[in-house]
């Protein structure tokens, strides 16, 4: 009797899904996964919004799937397009579910085929959960506004339509425009010598979960701390920030002596205005 019981147990396991989907995400990443995200955004401090588009590169896992479900929260979706086999962007119908207080809104995109890419034109809400818009009075100089993000735990969906779950990791790039005199930084490769003329460009070549998407915009200066370490801060704070963090390069070297080469390229830090209410957030 034991072999029969064992066989039944094995058959029972075979019919069970390989894994449970994230209950706080609308994404069906067992059918399709995001491989790369490109963001093209404009920062509007007067209206406290980011607007533009997100372009998602997809890996389809289920040949029968014809719907892409994404996580959003408070996003105004203007248009969705899918890239066809001829390289042409074609309109794709979409619907937004009612707002759930915990999960936000599901964006359902109906597709006639399995596109390699989809592009979503959208605008964030002025009260987007992940974006903090500071007035000049909340900065050290008191002259210019400031914005920073906090995507953890599931707030990335409030500033980009994504598969907002740690079960999905993707590379990303971004082009961001901001008012003159303000620097944009992101959780990606930042060029300290960039001027922002024509916009700010970023690339993250290593796959990350959505909660590690980060952006900061403000009156910022860059200071080198070593061959691959640096700090960004407001002009009135950059000197003290660089002094406080002067041993960062040594710290990275000490970590490498224990655990091997540092794999993220650069180790840069952003020191936020004094009104920042959180101790800190680590981003690649």
Label the predicted regions.
Residues 55-75, 163-164, 172-179:
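Surface-exposed beta-strand/loop patches in extracellular or lumenal glycoproteins
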Residues 4, 8-16:
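Bacterial N-terminal signal peptides
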Residues 52, 150-154, 162-284:
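Hydrophobic helix-coil surface modules that form long, contiguous segments used
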Residues 29, 107, 122-172, 218-225:
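Glycine/proline-rich low-complexity spacer/linker segments in large multi-domain proteins
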Residues 74-139, 201:
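A surface-exposed beta-strand-loop module
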Residues 22-24, 36-42, 103-109, 156-161, ...:
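Short structured motifs
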Residues 18-53, 63, 141-146, 166:
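N-terminal, polar/Ser/Thr-rich
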Residues 36-38, 49-55, 65-67, 106, ...:
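Intrinsic-disorder/low-complexity, polar/charged segments enriched in Ser/Thr/Lys/Arg/Asp/Glu/Gln
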């Amino acid at each position: 009797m034991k072999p029969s019981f064992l066989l039944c147990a094995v058959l029972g396991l075979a019919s069970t899904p390989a894994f449970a989907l994230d209950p706080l995400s609308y994404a069906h990443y067992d059918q399709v996964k995001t491989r790369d995200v490109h963001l093209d955004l404009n920062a509007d401090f007067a209206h406290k919004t980011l607007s533009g588009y997100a372009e998602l590169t997809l890996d389809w896992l289920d040949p029968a799937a014809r719907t892409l479900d994404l996580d959003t929260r408070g996003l105004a979706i203007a248009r969705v397009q899918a890239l066809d086999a001829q390289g042409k962007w074609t309109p794709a119908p979409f619907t937004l579910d009612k707002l759930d207080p915990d999960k936000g809104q599901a964006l359902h995109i109906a597709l006639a085929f399995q596109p390699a890419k989809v592009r979503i034109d959208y605008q964030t809400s002025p009260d987007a959960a992940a974006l903090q818009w500071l007035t000049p009075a909340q900065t050290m100089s008191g002259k210019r506004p400031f914005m920073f993000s906090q995507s953890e735990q599931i707030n990335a969906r409030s500033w980009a339509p994504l598969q907002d779950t740690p079960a999905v990791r993707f590379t990303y790039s971004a082009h961001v425009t901001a008012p003159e005199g303000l620097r944009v930084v992101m959780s990606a490769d930042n060029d300290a010598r960039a001027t922002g003329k024509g916009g700010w460009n970023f690339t993250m070549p290593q796959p990350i979960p959505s909660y590690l998407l980060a952006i900061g915009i403000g009156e910022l200066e860059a200071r080198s701390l070593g061959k691959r370490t640096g700090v960004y801060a407001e002009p009135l704070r950059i000197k003290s920030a660089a002094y406080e963090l002067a041993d960062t390069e040594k710290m990275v070297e000490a970590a490498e002596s224990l655990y091997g080469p540092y794999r993220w390229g650069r180790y840069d830090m952003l020191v936020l205005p004094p009104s920042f209410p959180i101790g800190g957030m680590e981003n690649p």
